[in-house]
Amino acid sequence: MKKIFIFAAAGLLLVAGCKGGKKAAGDSVTEPEAAASVAAGPKVMAREVPERMDDFVFENDLIAGRFYGKALEGDPTSPGLDVWVKLPGKLVADDWYAHAVSDPEYYHHDHGGKDCYKVSVSLGGGASAPLVGGKLSYPATNWREAAVLSQSDDAVTFVLKYPAWDAGGVSVRLEKTVTVTAGSYFCKVEDRYYGDFQELEIAAGFWIHEWKEGCAMGTDDDFIALWEPASDQSVEPEDGMIGIALVMPAEHMTEILDDGEKRHHICIAKVRSGEPLTYWFGSCWSKGDIKDFQQWTNTVKSQAGAAGIAAASSN
């Protein structure tokens, strides 16, 4: 098994790798110590937020994030994941949105966490898009349909639907199914692309923001990982560091994609129409339980291992 890890304080190293298709989907690995501190009651949530520009927000006791809806199109139109940082232990999204009704900047300030991650037009903290001629072909709109498919105190699954758009002369549409599990830094994703194609090349990954002192990046057979400043905002003097990762057990290639404006670390795989592309996106905050890139890498490796075990049992 080939393993490559990159730790860098300055400069950006291009990493390329290839792995075999011996694994597929599985369950998320949990963090028992963090989960044990959570009070009784729901430990997950996911819902549409019509009161805030049609966001679709989700969270568990460790992580939170959102995908942009119709009302925000153009500012930006992006399939990317907007990562929220937060301290472990409780759900915060509903409280933050409630305060934002009277103070729109409320969740941009630290209240045990905050929204300080910049998405722009990108894959953000973990999403996918067709790869056409070496460039990402983003959906022409934000999500237009959403539904919660199942929900309990410990897990919630939802689907977001993106209408058809032109991807290099091929009309494709996307159905994104996400499962959020209590006690995990990762969410499982099944992206299904539909269209009149035999195979479609898909890139799943995350945006690499400005490379600064303290940044680090690594890759292995089953994952790509990043450690970078949590924010490029100036609202707070110090927002700490954020860990981002994407786990993909299926056969894929990895590379750094630079279009002159943004750099993404991506996993590239081919899918047939309606075939699920399964991966996990994950995040952490240095002000929480995971303090450095080594801890984050260990957590990511555990998730990759869990995905592989589940894949082996399903094949």
Regions found by a protein language model. Give the residues of each.
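Accessory, usually C-terminal, subdomains that scaffold auxiliary metal cofactors
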Residues: 194, 210-263
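Sec-dependent N-terminal signal peptides
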Residues: 4-13
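Solvent-exposed N-terminal domain segments of exported/luminal and surface proteins
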Residues: 26-137
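Acidic (Asp/Glu-rich), glycine- and aromatic
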Residues: 174, 185-218
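Bacterial signal peptide processing site
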Residues: 19-21
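C-terminal motif of bacterial Sec signal peptides marking the signal peptidase cleavage site
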Residues: 15-17
